[in-house]
Amino acid sequence: MTAQLVARLLLVVGCTVIGLALAGCSPANASQPHIYVALGASDAVGIGAPDPAHDGWVPRFGASLGPDTRVVNLGVSGSTLHQALAEQLGPALDAHPDVVTVWLAVNDLNARVPLDSYAQDLDALLAALEPTHARILVANVPDLTALAPYAGVPADQLSAEVDRWNLVIADTTARHGAVLVDLHAHWQEVADHPEYLSADGFHPSPEGYQRLAAVFSETYADGG
Protein backbone atom coordinates (compact mmCIF):
# COMPACT_ATOMS: atom_id res chain seq x y z
CA MET A 1 0.00 0.00 0.00
CA THR A 2 1.46 3.33 -1.05
CA ALA A 3 1.87 6.25 1.28
CA GLN A 4 -0.56 8.25 -0.89
CA LEU A 5 -3.28 5.57 -0.56
CA VAL A 6 -2.77 5.37 3.21
CA ALA A 7 -3.19 9.12 3.47
CA ARG A 8 -6.43 8.97 1.48
CA LEU A 9 -7.79 6.20 3.70
CA LEU A 10 -6.95 8.15 6.83
CA LEU A 11 -8.68 11.20 5.39
CA VAL A 12 -11.85 9.21 4.64
CA VAL A 13 -11.90 7.65 8.11
CA GLY A 14 -11.32 11.00 9.77
CA CYS A 15 -14.12 12.67 7.84
CA THR A 16 -16.46 9.81 8.67
CA VAL A 17 -15.73 10.09 12.39
CA ILE A 18 -16.19 13.86 12.32
CA GLY A 19 -19.42 13.48 10.36
CA LEU A 20 -20.81 10.99 12.86
CA ALA A 21 -19.85 13.24 15.75
CA LEU A 22 -21.55 16.22 14.15
CA ALA A 23 -24.64 14.16 13.38
CA GLY A 24 -24.82 13.07 17.00
CA CYS A 25 -24.79 16.70 18.08
CA SER A 26 -27.36 17.92 15.58
CA PRO A 27 -30.80 19.02 16.78
CA ALA A 28 -32.40 16.12 14.93
CA ASN A 29 -30.55 13.67 17.14
CA ALA A 30 -30.53 15.63 20.37
CA SER A 31 -32.27 14.22 23.41
CA GLN A 32 -35.14 16.71 23.27
CA PRO A 33 -38.65 15.34 22.92
CA HIS A 34 -40.48 15.76 19.66
CA ILE A 35 -44.05 14.87 20.65
CA TYR A 36 -45.68 16.08 23.85
CA VAL A 37 -49.20 14.90 24.73
CA ALA A 38 -51.35 16.53 27.42
CA LEU A 39 -54.22 14.63 29.03
CA GLY A 40 -56.47 16.83 31.09
CA ALA A 41 -59.59 18.90 31.59
CA SER A 42 -60.40 22.62 31.50
CA ASP A 43 -56.97 23.62 32.77
CA ALA A 44 -55.36 21.83 29.83
CA VAL A 45 -57.77 23.64 27.50
CA GLY A 46 -56.74 26.94 29.08
CA ILE A 47 -60.09 28.11 30.44
CA GLY A 48 -59.59 31.44 32.18
CA ALA A 49 -57.04 32.74 29.68
CA PRO A 50 -58.11 35.15 26.90
CA ASP A 51 -55.90 33.29 24.42
CA PRO A 52 -55.82 29.64 25.60
CA ALA A 53 -53.78 28.44 22.62
CA HIS A 54 -50.96 30.75 23.69
CA ASP A 55 -51.50 31.56 27.36
CA GLY A 56 -52.46 28.12 28.71
CA TRP A 57 -49.94 26.08 30.69
CA VAL A 58 -49.89 23.26 28.11
CA PRO A 59 -48.59 25.36 25.18
CA ARG A 60 -46.19 27.16 27.52
CA PHE A 61 -44.78 23.90 28.88
CA GLY A 62 -44.62 22.47 25.37
CA ALA A 63 -42.62 25.48 24.20
CA SER A 64 -40.13 24.91 27.02
CA LEU A 65 -39.39 21.43 25.65
CA GLY A 66 -37.78 22.82 22.51
CA PRO A 67 -38.68 24.42 19.18
CA ASP A 68 -39.11 21.08 17.40
CA THR A 69 -41.64 19.76 19.91
CA ARG A 70 -45.14 19.10 18.58
CA VAL A 71 -47.83 19.68 21.21
CA VAL A 72 -50.88 17.38 21.14
CA ASN A 73 -53.37 18.83 23.60
CA LEU A 74 -56.15 16.31 24.23
CA GLY A 75 -57.69 18.15 27.18
CA VAL A 76 -61.49 18.34 27.35
CA SER A 77 -63.31 20.75 29.66
CA GLY A 78 -65.13 18.92 32.44
CA SER A 79 -63.39 15.62 31.78
CA THR A 80 -62.98 13.08 34.55
CA LEU A 81 -60.25 10.48 34.53
CA HIS A 82 -62.71 7.76 33.55
CA GLN A 83 -63.87 9.83 30.58
CA ALA A 84 -60.26 10.47 29.59
CA LEU A 85 -59.63 6.73 29.53
CA ALA A 86 -62.35 6.42 26.91
CA GLU A 87 -61.73 9.61 24.95
CA GLN A 88 -58.13 10.76 25.37
CA LEU A 89 -56.02 7.64 25.91
CA GLY A 90 -56.45 6.23 22.40
CA PRO A 91 -55.34 9.41 20.61
CA ALA A 92 -52.49 9.76 23.11
CA LEU A 93 -51.16 6.31 22.24
CA ASP A 94 -51.62 6.97 18.51
CA ALA A 95 -49.43 10.06 18.83
CA HIS A 96 -46.41 7.99 19.99
CA PRO A 97 -45.46 10.56 22.63
CA ASP A 98 -42.07 11.32 24.11
CA VAL A 99 -43.56 13.28 27.02
CA VAL A 100 -47.02 12.97 28.59
CA THR A 101 -48.61 15.13 31.26
CA VAL A 102 -51.67 13.99 33.20
CA TRP A 103 -53.70 16.36 35.35
CA LEU A 104 -57.05 14.73 35.96
CA ALA A 105 -58.30 14.69 39.53
CA VAL A 106 -60.22 17.78 40.61
CA ASN A 107 -63.30 17.03 38.49
CA ASP A 108 -63.37 13.51 39.90
CA LEU A 109 -63.16 14.79 43.45
CA ASN A 110 -65.88 17.36 42.78
CA ALA A 111 -68.11 14.67 41.26
CA ARG A 112 -67.59 12.48 44.34
CA VAL A 113 -66.10 9.66 42.29
CA PRO A 114 -65.19 6.88 44.75
CA LEU A 115 -61.47 7.09 45.44
CA ASP A 116 -61.06 3.35 44.82
CA SER A 117 -62.57 3.76 41.35
CA TYR A 118 -60.32 6.71 40.63
CA ALA A 119 -57.28 4.72 41.74
CA GLN A 120 -58.20 1.87 39.39
CA ASP A 121 -58.62 4.29 36.49
CA LEU A 122 -55.29 6.01 37.17
CA ASP A 123 -53.60 2.63 37.40
CA ALA A 124 -55.13 1.60 34.06
CA LEU A 125 -54.16 4.87 32.38
CA LEU A 126 -50.52 4.74 33.48
CA ALA A 127 -50.25 1.03 32.67
CA ALA A 128 -51.45 1.76 29.14
CA LEU A 129 -48.97 4.62 28.73
CA GLU A 130 -45.94 2.72 30.07
CA PRO A 131 -45.17 0.84 26.81
CA THR A 132 -44.69 4.17 25.02
CA HIS A 133 -41.55 4.73 27.15
CA ALA A 134 -42.55 8.39 27.34
CA ARG A 135 -41.62 10.52 30.32
CA ILE A 136 -44.90 10.76 32.21
CA LEU A 137 -45.65 13.59 34.63
CA VAL A 138 -48.75 13.33 36.84
CA ALA A 139 -50.04 16.35 38.75
CA ASN A 140 -51.87 16.06 42.05
CA VAL A 141 -54.74 18.01 43.62
CA PRO A 142 -53.90 21.56 44.70
CA ASP A 143 -54.94 23.09 48.00
CA LEU A 144 -58.60 23.70 47.22
CA THR A 145 -59.16 25.56 50.49
CA ALA A 146 -57.57 28.60 48.84
CA LEU A 147 -60.22 28.73 46.11
CA ALA A 148 -63.47 30.68 46.39
CA PRO A 149 -65.82 27.92 45.12
CA TYR A 150 -64.94 25.84 48.21
CA ALA A 151 -65.47 28.62 50.73
CA GLY A 152 -68.50 26.87 52.22
CA VAL A 153 -66.65 23.61 52.88
CA PRO A 154 -64.92 23.21 56.26
CA ALA A 155 -61.21 23.68 55.54
CA ASP A 156 -60.03 20.79 57.71
CA GLN A 157 -62.50 18.39 56.09
CA LEU A 158 -61.53 19.49 52.58
CA SER A 159 -57.80 19.30 53.36
CA ALA A 160 -58.16 15.77 54.70
CA GLU A 161 -60.01 14.68 51.57
CA VAL A 162 -57.42 16.26 49.28
CA ASP A 163 -54.66 14.53 51.26
CA ARG A 164 -56.37 11.16 50.73
CA TRP A 165 -56.55 11.71 47.00
CA ASN A 166 -52.98 12.95 46.78
CA LEU A 167 -51.69 9.91 48.64
CA VAL A 168 -53.34 7.64 46.07
CA ILE A 169 -52.00 9.75 43.20
CA ALA A 170 -48.46 9.70 44.62
CA ASP A 171 -48.47 5.94 45.27
CA THR A 172 -49.90 5.05 41.86
CA THR A 173 -47.58 7.44 40.06
CA ALA A 174 -44.50 6.02 41.77
CA ARG A 175 -45.56 2.43 41.15
CA HIS A 176 -45.63 3.06 37.41
CA GLY A 177 -42.32 4.91 37.32
CA ALA A 178 -43.99 8.21 36.48
CA VAL A 179 -43.09 11.52 38.11
CA LEU A 180 -45.28 13.47 40.50
CA VAL A 181 -45.81 17.17 39.86
CA ASP A 182 -46.60 18.39 43.36
CA LEU A 183 -48.95 21.28 42.69
CA HIS A 184 -50.29 21.02 46.23
CA ALA A 185 -46.90 22.01 47.62
CA HIS A 186 -46.84 25.13 45.45
CA TRP A 187 -50.42 26.25 46.02
CA GLN A 188 -49.64 28.68 48.83
CA GLU A 189 -48.48 30.92 46.02
CA VAL A 190 -52.13 31.41 45.06
CA ALA A 191 -52.83 33.09 48.38
CA ASP A 192 -49.73 35.24 47.92
CA HIS A 193 -50.56 36.05 44.29
CA PRO A 194 -54.31 36.50 43.78
CA GLU A 195 -53.55 37.56 40.22
CA TYR A 196 -52.84 33.89 39.49
CA LEU A 197 -56.62 33.24 39.42
CA SER A 198 -59.06 34.30 36.72
CA ALA A 199 -62.32 36.12 37.42
CA ASP A 200 -64.17 32.88 38.21
CA GLY A 201 -61.91 32.30 41.23
CA PHE A 202 -61.20 28.73 40.12
CA HIS A 203 -59.32 28.58 36.84
CA PRO A 204 -55.88 30.16 36.48
CA SER A 205 -55.29 33.51 34.82
CA PRO A 206 -52.56 33.90 32.17
CA GLU A 207 -50.14 34.67 35.03
CA GLY A 208 -51.32 31.58 36.87
CA TYR A 209 -50.91 29.41 33.79
CA GLN A 210 -47.41 30.78 33.32
CA ARG A 211 -46.54 29.72 36.87
CA LEU A 212 -48.15 26.30 36.35
CA ALA A 213 -46.06 25.77 33.24
CA ALA A 214 -42.97 26.74 35.22
CA VAL A 215 -43.73 24.14 37.91
CA PHE A 216 -44.08 21.43 35.25
CA SER A 217 -40.88 22.63 33.56
CA GLU A 218 -38.96 22.66 36.84
CA THR A 219 -40.12 19.13 37.65
CA TYR A 220 -39.19 17.95 34.17
CA ALA A 221 -35.75 19.58 34.36
CA ASP A 222 -35.12 18.00 37.76
CA GLY A 223 -35.30 14.59 36.15
CA GLY A 224 -39.01 14.10 35.76
Task: Specify the residue positions occupied by each region the protein language model found.
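Secretory targeting and sorting signals
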Residues: 2-28
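Cell-envelope and extracellular/periplasmic
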Residues: 75, 79, 104-105
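Short loop/turn segments at beta->alpha junctions
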Residues: 80-81, 114
